[in-house]
Amino acid sequence: MEASQDTFTVAGRTFQSRLLVGTGKYRDLDETREAIEVSGAEIVTVAIRRTNIGQNPDEPNLLDVISPERYTLLPNTAGCYTAKDAVRTCRLARELLDGHNLVKLEVLGDEKTLYPDIPATLEAAEQLVADGFDVMVYTSDDPITAKRLEEVGCVAVMPLGAPIGSGLGIQNHWNILTIVENASVPVLVDAGVGTASDASEAMELGCDGVLMNTAIAGAQRPVLMASAMRKAVEAGREAYLAGRIPRKRFASASSPLEGTFF
């Protein structure tokens, strides 16, 4: 399969890149713009409660460097700890972005772990779906929860690989694999990626994409890391499509003895 044919579709929108990136933690908007350009990402997530996209006319506007005409914006509810706040934030985003209805839902449980509050996440997801939103949802790596979120109408499930910003990489490969196997909507690892091998690993498990922010913005050289992540996601996807060899306990000679000359 050619790269141009291996597209990623969510909520009826089709993309070439399977790397989704955030906009926080960069030194300035110029670095934000350059890193996102180099990443090749087409979907860019924005924390509505923390990022100015027009709410504050006297402050720098992210949309001046991340144009909605070039990128698909994915407003998110980072910093929300209740379903009510998350729903309100999504409605604000829709108002600011002229009816844009693709959102990333996250309802956090506490400040220490930033793990999702699952009951509140389900409550918010149900309300947002009923209100006409296309909901991509941050969740735990529990396969049952992921399936339940799909059943309430979320257009993508986004299990954490590890706590947000931890850089620990995927901690529970088997759960992520089970979520992928059970899902009929896209699955994207969201949170915990620390370096390129983590992103590649997520794709090798069969995930449809990877979303990251800190792994790029927090690197010593963010623009170079953005390039590395782009290649890692592409390599991991190709490896998944190619089909890895099975793991074996013992050796298997790469040069068979049959037909040897002596």
Curated annotation (Swiss-Prot):
Transmembrane helix recorded as keyword: no
Top-rank lineage group of the source organism: Bacteria
Protein's name according to its UniProt entry: Thiazole synthase
Family matches, as Gene3D superfamilies: Aldolase class I
The gene coding this protein: thiG
A Pfam entry, by short name: ThiG
Biological process, per Gene Ontology: thiamine diphosphate biosynthetic process
Organism: Alkalilimnicola ehrlichii (strain ATCC BAA-1101 / DSM 17681 / MLHE-1)
Molecular-function GO terms, alphabetical: thiazole synthase activity
Family matches, as PANTHER family: THIAZOLE SYNTHASE
Subcellular location: Cytoplasm
